[in-house]
Design a protein with these regions (language model features):
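Short coil/turn segments at alpha/beta junctions that flank glycine-rich nucleotide-binding fingerprints
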Residues: 31, 81, 133-137, 177-180, ...
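Aromatic pocket-lining residues of Rossmann-like dinucleotide-binding sites
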Residues: 28, 175, 231
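Conserved mid-core segment of classical short-chain dehydrogenase/reductases
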Residues: 55, 61-72, 76-81, 87-113, ...
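C-terminal helical subdomain
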Residues: 121, 184, 203-239, 244-248
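A glycine/serine/threonine-rich, flexible loop-to-helix segment
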Residues: 177, 189-213, 253-255
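Catalytic loop of short-chain dehydrogenase/reductase
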Residues: 13-22, 93-132, 136-177, 189-191, ...
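Canonical Rossmann dinucleotide-binding motif of NAD(H)/NADP(H)-dependent dehydrogenases/reductases
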Residues: 2-37
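Hydrophobic structural elements of the Rossmann-like NAD(P)H-binding subdomain
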Residues: 11, 89, 141, 182-185, ...
Length: 255
């Protein structure tokens, strides 16, 4: 019996086989989940292609969090397909180039606003889309990167992750009475398409494995996927508002 047998789960953020969201989707499917994916903008066709590597008939919905109407459309499409939904993965993040790479003091508000809406507010948008169908409770899990410290080059995306963490706590508060949990997985660096677009990402690669007491491989997304699938399952019924660090222990170490 799989951890997610009989579960219906919406997965955002699948672009390529290297995506963390793909690793989660693949493992969730192997653990028995029925899936729907979402994609957005120019990446939608890429998501559709990658979805075929999971299943030939996997539905892919358009969900651009910059468009309010997409939230309503996703909710309607899910209601047409399923009478309930059990879980959702938030793997949505983006920042314009000007918001990354050591340009913190010069980034204009318009670019910050785009990063904030796509990377943080989108968790609320996802909740709006899925919670009407979480009639028997459910689990929302988001991918995070530790926002307790300032990282080289991460800049406004780090601020967005701090906002994401706070958003998750408030969703946990307001959705808890409906038995809907909201948690984040703060992953160590994994070599994905998104990660490679962050200036200085290789600095994380160089030091993480040496400092993490359990070690760390930037080429192993499955350790992150396992945590996400566990949180999507029924095995954490009393856990919400949590940030689960899956980073080899790096976050707990001093200099």
């Amino acid at each position: 019996v799989g951890l997610l047998d009989g579960k219906r789960v919406l997965i955002t953020g699948v672009l390529t086989k290297d995506s963390l969201a793909f690793a989660v989707a693949d493992l969730a499917q192997r653990e028995g989940a029925e899936l729907v994916l979402t994609g957005a903008g120019r990446g939608l066709s890429l998501t559709q292609r990658t979805a075929r590597k999971l299943s030939a008939d996997l539905d892919v919905l358009e969900f651009d969090v910059m468009e309010d109407r997409h939230t309503e459309a996703v909710a309607a499409a899910l209601a047409d397909k399923w009478d309930r939904i059990d879980g959702a993965l938030h793997a949505i993040a983006f920042a314009p180039e000007t918001a990354l790479g050591g340009n913190f003091l010069n980034t204009q508000w318009d670019d910050i606003a785009v990063a904030m809406r796509i990377s943080a507010w989108s968790l609320r948008a996802l909740a709006d889309a899925v919670t009407p169908l979480m009639t028997e409770g459910g689990s929302i899990v988001g991918l995070d990167f530790d926002a307790q410290v300032a990282w080289p080059g991460y800049d406004w995306m780090g601020v967005c992750k701090a906002a994401l963490e706070s958003t998750s706590r408030y969703l946990a508060r307001d959705l808890g009475p409906r038995n809907i949990r909201c948690n984040l997985v703060a992953a160590g660096p994994v070599r994905t398409l998104a990660a490679r677009s962050i200036p200085g990402f290789e600095l994380f690669e160089d030091v993480w494995d040496g400092r993490a007491p359990l070690g760390w491989s930037v080429r192993d997304p499955e350790v992150v996927a396992k945590a996400c699938v566990a949180l999507l399952s029924d095995w954490f019924p009393a856990t919400t508002g949590e940030i689960l660090h899956v980073d080899g222990g790096y976050h707990a170490m001093g200099v």
